[in-house]
Structure formats: structure tokens, C-alpha cells
Amino acid sequence: MKLPALLTLGVAASTMVLAAIAPDQVPLNDAKKDELPEKFLIELAPGDTRWVTEDEKWELKREGLKFFDITAEVEQGFLPKVFPTPAVVNFPSELNRTAEVKQLASQLSKENMFNHLTNFTSFHTRYYKSTAGTQSATWLFEQVQQTVNNSLAVKYGAKVETFNHSWSQFSIIASIPGRTNKTVVVGAHQDSINMYLPTIMAAPGADDDGSGTVTILEALRVLLQSDAVAQGNATNTIEFHWYSAEEAGLLGSQAVFSKYKNENRDIKSMLQQDMTGYSQGTLDAGEQESVGVITDYVHSGLTEFIMKVVTGYCDIPFVLTKCGYACSDHASASRYGYPSAFVIESKFEHSSQRIHTMWDTVEYLDFDHMLQHAKMTLGLVYELAFAEL
């Protein structure tokens, strides 16, 4: 996600490094001084590519720039058409499952999200190349597995799998079979980063994107309380994704959707939940609490349906906002031709300024606001699960 506007945090961070380093934490990739640093090909806009080191990646992010890391695509000799026209999907013109969704939504728990996020942010960092990042992914996998195992769905083919990468932190995919292979996807990214010293400094990542991670986990838990969904009677298959290495250039989600494209997977929609917990920026601006519906680099039909979902199932309105190129994992779905959308906690300019620092902690989040994102996620998935797409 974006760079905190308060760059003075960087000065403060540099004076607090020793306090933020875990006792047994050592810098990663401690290469010899005479070795040239590894370089990566990034894309900052359609056709705008450059080779950079990993340190240069973080410098670009500190400047507020977002990008795809497309190194793997080049190495494989394949580059997708940038934002190809997605397959035509006829999203519903109205909400059709109001009674079921509202009954399920009453079971969503702020306490569950708080408890999960408190545990998830207790890892020193969730940096994708770190030991702690692998440990946090393992903890999250166990929570997702337990959520599925505690439902009827486990008896009807639901499963949770790791999606392994060339780096240590894996992505996680929970699948709930439907009557067809047409698939509805919800995603969040599980990794975190401290933009000042990524390999050693604390990166609790409560809002970015611990909030989205636990929001969709809670939506999954409640969704599986539906016997129709759990028993595989929904029209469409449902997947929940937790991506690794979003902060490094959408690496995890690109790997997932590249594989899906090669397998000719029929992905009908993808919603990203990245930063769902901060409302104070909106209130401080004197504006009404709302969720931010992203309008750039997204699928217009899916986005329009999401507006209906927010209006029908949330207690607060939506505002339209933009986040730029490659701003979160939905962009990877779009890159491979799949309809995608993104809903964030507020107007982009009012979102948290503490992200990518040691101060992105649970105490600054609003779990009532996260509950609205959980309602929206649940409503969208349930509606689309039973829709003829």
C-alpha cells in the first residue's frame, strides 16, 4: 500500500532501531560487500519498467510509488497483456439473498477479529523473507484450517492449502466447492513491512494488512455457517486467499493468478480487502465514516455491484476513491484478465499514515469499522456464490 505522508516517522524510526529489533533478529541476505546486489524488474505503470535492487524497491515505496515486480514473468519468457479486457461477466442487477445474508451477518464477531489480530501482530514482522514471516503464515494457516474443520464444509470437499513460492513465506488458499467450477475469490495480503529497515525492524502491520486478513477470516467463518454453502450447494466455487509478498510488488498474488491463467481457471470475480480498520482519518477530516470503493484499474461491473452490496448490507455508506497502479493484489487478478475490485477503509487520502512502520498497531484500529468490511465481504461472496455468472 501507500507510503505514510509523515516522513518524519523515518527520522524517529532511525533513533529507535535498537528497541525495535528482536533479540535474535539479524539482517537477511548478509552478502559479501564485493558482491553486486540482486536486481528485479518492476513495472510502475503500463510499459514503464526499470531494473532495481531490493533497497531501491523500498526507496520507491517510501516515495509513495507502487509497482508490480515482474521479474518472474521475464524469467519464464512470458508477459501478460497489461490489463487485458476481462471476460464478460453478468453481475446481478440487484441483491437476491438479503434474508440469508442478514441472518448470517448477525453472527459476525468483533471480538474474534480483535483476538486474531492481536495474535497476528505479535510476530516481530511478517516480512516475506523472514523467519517470523514464515511463522506468522504458519499460524494463519492453522487458524484458517481450524475454521474450515469446525464447519460442515470439511465433509463436503472444502480444503485449505499452502501455495508455495521461491521465498519462505507461503500464500494460503481456502476452497469451498460449489456446483460449478466458476469461482468467486476474496483476498487479503498477510505480509507486512517496515519501510526503513525491512529485515530487522518491527512491522506489526495491524492495518496493513492484518485488518484485511482477519476481516476475511471472520467472513469465512460465518459464511460456513450456511449449510447450503458448506454442503457444496452454491452455484459457484468460493476461494479465500491470503497472499504473501504483496509489499514487494504483488509477488504472491501474481504467482497465484499466473498459475490460474495457465490452468484456464474460470475466475468470475476477485475482491481485495487491504486496510479495513482505520476510520479516524475520515472523522478528523470532518467527514462521515464510510468505506472507500476504488474506481481506478478495477472492473466496472463488479465495482458497481459492490456499491449495491455496501448499500444493502452495511450501516455506513461508500465513497468513491482511487489508489493508483498496482496498489494491491486485485491488480494481479486484473493483470491476468480476471474481473477484480478493491474496497479500502476510507478515501485513500484519509487512510492510515502509520502503515509500514512500527506504529501500525491494533490500538489505532476501529473494530466497528472492520465489522462493516466483514458485512460487505460476506454479502458479496454469498450473493455471487449463488448467482448465475
From Swiss-Prot:
Residues that carry a glycan: 96, 119, 149, 164, 181, 233
Enzyme class: hydrolase
Signal peptide: 1-19
Binding site for Zn(2+) 2: 208, 247, 356
Binding site for Zn(2+) 1: 189, 208, 274
GO cellular component: extracellular region
Entry's localization field: Secreted
Propeptide regions on this chain: 20-88
GO biological processes: proteolysis
Keywords in alphabetical order: Aminopeptidase, Disulfide bond, Glycoprotein, Hydrolase, Metal-binding, Protease, Secreted, Signal, Zinc, Zymogen
Disulfide bonds: 323-327
Cofactor(s) named in the record: Zn(2+)
This enzyme's EC code(s): 3.4.11.-
GO terms of molecular function: aminopeptidase activity; metal ion binding; metalloexopeptidase activity
Cofactor note (record): Binds 2 Zn(2+) ions per subunit.
Main localization of the protein described in the UniProt heading: secreted
Family classification: Belongs to the peptidase M28 family. M28E subfamily.
Subunit comment: Monomer.
Role noted for this protein: Extracellular aminopeptidase that allows assimilation of proteinaceous substrates.
Protein name: Leucine aminopeptidase 1
Originating organism: Paracoccidioides brasiliensis (strain Pb18)
Annotated gene: LAP1
